Amino acid sequence: MSFPIERVRSEFPLLAREVNGQPLAYLDSAASAQKPQAVIDRELDFYRHGYAAVHRGIHTLSAEATQEMEAVREKVAAFINAGSAEEIIFVKGTTEGINLVANSFGRHFLQPGDSIIITEMEHHANIVPWQMLAQERGLNLRVWPLQPDGTLDLARLPGLIDASTKLLALTQVSNVLGTVNPVQEITAQAKAAGLKVLIDGAQAVMHQRVDVQALDCDFYVFSGHKLYGPSGIGILYGRQALLQQMPPWEGGGSMIQQVSLTAGTTYAEPPWRFEAGSPNTAGMMGLGAAIDYVNTLGLEAIGDYEQSLMHYALEALQQVPRLKIYGPAERAGVIAFNLGEHHAYDVGSFLDQYGIAIRTGHHCAMPLMAFYNVPSMCRASLALYNTRDEVDRLVAGLQRIQKLLG
């Protein structure tokens, strides 16, 4: 059965708008995806009919909201095949999830002289927290270098590991190159050497089925807004045995058992230990609806459609003279490119005049820009609602820019 692209597009209301008198071609979902009506309706319905502060409320609305919040936790656990809903921590997004691990796991388990491995393709969110921790704790940060095609050489990993190495933190899918790292194989190598593994899944969960138990990772993080859900909500999965040993990283309400000015404070069990303060309950409802949406379409069907579109786009872009595409042939979600000597900002600005939305800049990956010796790149990203017609418009727009600017 063919992918129901026309129906899918009709379910995303923002796709109907025009930009600069042109139909919008939204090719920036890797930055943030648009939302289906089902997600918008669920969040609105919660505010209209079900909103209340969760935890400890004895009245009906509070009890219902708490039950719905925990139901979303169960839904997320099933979505990534966690062993238990108690391994699912609600956070603001991928960035906060990684910072939580750095500040809790890192400060508790890592000692001066220990080392952490990251890769050269990481988003700043999976670089800067480790740099901050390394500076504070006297750790060593080791970088797994890229190959020219934007992939990792797995044969290089053993040379980065010694007795001091405690953690590997890497992305599953590069937010710039679309490189799909073989994270299951990488995790197996790292775990065999005694490392803990954190996987940044921000660019993966919307394109492919994720099974954290099969991956055997210790931590997995992703954001809701890239998964067609609301902004301000994300997920940190943590292996339960590790979470039990980790101290809280923020203090406040909801994350305690008892507070005493004389006897001190005792903390709640995970995951609530890591969820201080009033949570983004409406965002949780929207995230649950987003998971329902992609599950209904089927991640396998979504992945097949997107891969077909990606192959079409890569072939079509060959028609543009002096266009340089970065990264491997096999990729997910994104195409990073530059057009001759033209600055990415200028290319993006021209495309916007034609109603085509792409992302330009360093994409929060300055070390990757340095690897390719460029200050910036253009990035077009493909999602389940994009079409071949939009790819054709991108190609035509780039050809037009080439004629105008030379």
Swiss-Prot record:
CDD domains per record: SufS_like (cd06453)
Protein EC: 2.8.1.7, 4.4.1.16
GO cellular component: cytoplasm
Subunit and partners: Homodimer. Interacts with SufE and the SufBCD complex composed of SufB, SufC and SufD. The interaction with SufE is required to mediate the direct transfer of the sulfur atom from the S-sulfanylcysteine.
HAMAP family for the chain: SufS_aminotrans_5
Family: Belongs to the class-V pyridoxal-phosphate-dependent aminotransferase family. Csd subfamily.
Name of the protein in question: Cysteine desulfurase
Biological source species: Serratia proteamaculans (strain 568)
